[in-house]
Structures are given as structure tokens and as C-alpha cells.
Amino acid sequence: MQTKPINQLDFVDSELTSFVSHLETTYLDQNKGAFIVTANPEIGFEAMQNPRYEAVLSSADFILPDGIGVVMVSKLIGKPLQSRIAGYDLFTSLLDKADQKKKRVFFYGAAKHVIAETIERVKRDFPGIEIAGYSDGYVKDQREVADKIAASTPDMVFVALGYPNQEFFIHKYRHLFPQAVAVGLGGSFDVFSGNVKRAPSFFIRFHLEWMYRLLTNPARWRRMLSIPKYVTAVLKHERASAKPHYTGQVKDQSRHL
């Protein structure tokens, strides 16, 4: 799977259908695990500020450009990515695959009523999925949840704890369920369960989901600042990387008489 670097992270350069097909043939059909990060500008900016988090993201098998801000900055630095791959779209696409292939899936994250409603919808709309287990995101002992996941032998693990917690969790415990495709999904359970409304198709088609979220929840304006902050930080990093570095060696071209 082709990737392109933005700052220190290698982003998948593909589109949703091709990526899911690659996951299906190379991982799901082979019972091979993978760690997938769905990185929006907030995650990208946090990684630039936090070396430990950056290292965790870099350990993932795939980093997806989940956010038009990531795609936009890729074009500005001359490394254009083909498409945004939204975490929610990946989630529903993988549910389709799990339904078709009778896969075992574990769901972890969100509030108790949200995870309960998520499981209820999965049972209704994806009857072929075998629910390996689930847990809300407020269990204090994460190792307890990790052991529960391991014991359930899932084919897929969806973790919706929000960044950076979901990535730290998968990175720390994926060795307990090495056969599973594990994905960090942010607030996807909230949308899937109907507790949060996703942007109408018009906003999605024109890459304006951020505007819809801001219009419907003005309190998010501080989070929206991550987009220009990320773009500015990446451009600054690219300019610094492009500058020639003085090696300390100067060739003596003087004429000796």
C-alpha cells in the first residue's frame, strides 16, 4: 500500500474502496492483525507536540488521512494524497465485510448507553457479525478490558476512546490479540448509534463536515483551531527541512602562488 510522508507520519495514499479491499485480502482473509490510525489534523498536530504519541502512531501499520485538513496540507507541500479516508466510513465498510464473512468483532469505548445502542444496531443491521464482546469506555482498568478482548479472540477490534487514549491502548495491548485488525475510531459509536448526527451529504461531498460540526456545536470552535495550527506547523517543518545544512567543511579554492 503506497504511502506519502507528512512531517514524520506516513499516510496511506489511496481511497476507501481500494484500502478496504487491501485489508480484506491481505489481513482479514489471512487472519493477520493490523493497527490502523485514523488521523485528522488534531491528531497530526498532537503528534508534532508529543514525541511519545508520534512514536505510537508511527508504529501503526496504516495511518489514514481522516480530515480534509490532512489532504489539503499534503497538496500544499507537493505530496498530494488521493483522498480523505474518514474513520466513520472505514468503520461502516468493515462492518459490511465482517457481516459478509461472519467475523468476530469486539467494540470498546463511548458511554454505556452509546455502546449499548451501538451493539443493538449492529445486531439489527449486520446479523452476520458475531459480537465477540463489548465494553464502555469508562472502565478504570484498561488491562481488564484488554484481557477480555484477548479471551474473545476477535477478528476486528474497534476502539472509540478518543485520541490519544485509543492509540495508546491499541499500541500497548495489541500483542494480546495479534490476529485482530484494530482501529481507533474517535466518536464513531456516537454517530453510529444516532446520539450524534453526522453532517448531511452536501457537507460531506464538499469536505465541509468541520463547518457543519461548528454550526451545530459552536463550543467546538477551539478544536477547529487545530486545522490552521496543523497546516502552519507542517509548512514550517517543510521549510526548515528544505534549507541546506552547513556541514562545517569548506573546500579551499584559493590559489597558491
Curated annotation (Swiss-Prot):
Pathway: Cell wall biogenesis; poly(ribitol phosphate) teichoic acid biosynthesis. The keyword Mitochondrion does not apply. The keyword ATP-binding does not apply. InterPro entries: TagA_TarA, WecG_TagA_CpsF. One of its GO terms (biological process) is cell wall organization. It catalyses: UDP-N-acetyl-alpha-D-mannosamine + N-acetyl-alpha-D-glucosaminyl-di-trans,octa-cis-undecaprenyl diphosphate = N-acetyl-beta-D-mannosaminyl-(1->4)-N-acetyl-alpha-D-glucosaminyl di-trans,octa-cis-undecaprenyl diphosphate + UDP + H(+). Its EC number is 2.4.1.187. It holds the Pfam family Glyco_tran_WecG. GO terms for molecular function: N-acetylglucosaminyldiphosphoundecaprenol N-acetyl-beta-D-mannosaminyltransferase activity. Keywords: Cell wall biogenesis/degradation, Glycosyltransferase, Teichoic acid biosynthesis, Transferase. Disulfide bonds: none annotated. Belongs to the glycosyltransferase 26 family. TagA/TarA subfamily. Catalyzes the conversion of GlcNAc-PP-undecaprenol into ManNAc-GlcNAc-PP-undecaprenol, the first committed lipid intermediate in the de novo synthesis of teichoic acid. NCBIfam families: wecG_tagA_cpsF. This is N-acetylglucosaminyldiphosphoundecaprenol N-acetyl-beta-D-mannosaminyltransferase. It comes from Bacillus spizizenii (strain ATCC 23059 / NRRL B-14472 / W23) (Bacillus subtilis subsp. spizizenii). The gene is tarA.
